[in-house]
Amino acid sequence: MNNKTEMGSSTSGNCSSVSTTGLANSGSESDLRQRDLIDERKRKRKQSNRESARRSRMRKQKHLDDLTAQVTHLRKENAQIVAGIAVTTQHYVTIEAENDILRAQVLELNHRLQSLNEIVDFVESSSSGFGMETGQGLFDGGLFDGVMNPMNLGFYNQPIMASASTAGDVFNC
């Protein structure tokens, strides 16, 4: 019986050692499963991070491409504006030169008008001695319609004849 008891005890000892080993194995299997899960999560997280970084690089590249296209567009637009400014400046210079000419012509015409007004004033003040009625102007029955009318003056209708001998006589006096 002792043998049986020993056997029984050894059997029971074996069972307990098997169950202890089984518990130890199941604990290490559980740890392995947890480690595998943790490793799987790490691997998935790394993969997710790689994908996120790839998407981020793609967004960054797209943004860079958009900015490059915008720079190209703005440079073209700037070149067009500069060309437009050059054309407008040339038009301005041309118009300014024309305005300078017109201003000079206005001054000349104002001087001529002033001279003509002085002549008219002189003729009107001198015409009072010719027996003109008061209220008559130069052209409405006044001086030019009467005696001073170029059409009434005979020498305006005569041709001017000059020769070298008559010119010498006139200038040698």
Swiss-Prot record:
Entries under SUPFAM superfamilies matching the protein: Leucine zipper domain
Stretches the record annotates as Leucine-zipper: 67-81
Keyword Membrane: no
Keyword ATP-binding (UniProt): no
UniProt subcellular location: Nucleus
Compositionally biased region (Basic and acidic residues): 30-41
Highest taxon above the source species: Eukaryota
Observed effect of gene inactivation: No visible phenotype under normal growth conditions, but seeds have decreased germination speed after imbibition, without affecting overall germination rate.
Chain positions covered by the region annotation Disordered: 1-65
Residues annotated as domain bZIP: 39-102
Transmembrane segments: none
Gene Ontology molecular function, alphabetical: DNA-binding transcription factor activity; protein heterodimerization activity; sequence-specific DNA binding; transcription cis-regulatory region binding
Gene Ontology CC terms, in alphabetical order: nucleus
Region feature Basic motif, mapped onto this chain: 41-62
Biased composition (Low complexity): 8-22
Tissue expression as described in the entry: Expressed in the micropylar endosperm and radicle tip in early germinating seeds.
Biological-process GO terms, alphabetical: seed germination
Keywords per UniProt: DNA-binding, Nucleus, Transcription, Transcription regulation
Quaternary structure and partners: Forms heterodimers with BZIP1, BZIP9, BZIP10, BZIP25 and BZIP63.
Role: Transcription factor that binds to the DNA G-box motif 5'-CACGTG-3' of MAN7 promoter. Involved in the positive regulation of seed germination through MAN7 gene activation. MAN7 is required for both, loosening of the micropylar endosperm, and rupture of the seed coat in germinating seeds.
Name assigned to this protein: bZIP transcription factor 44
Species lineage: Eukaryota, Viridiplantae, Streptophyta, Embryophyta, Tracheophyta
Gene: BZIP44
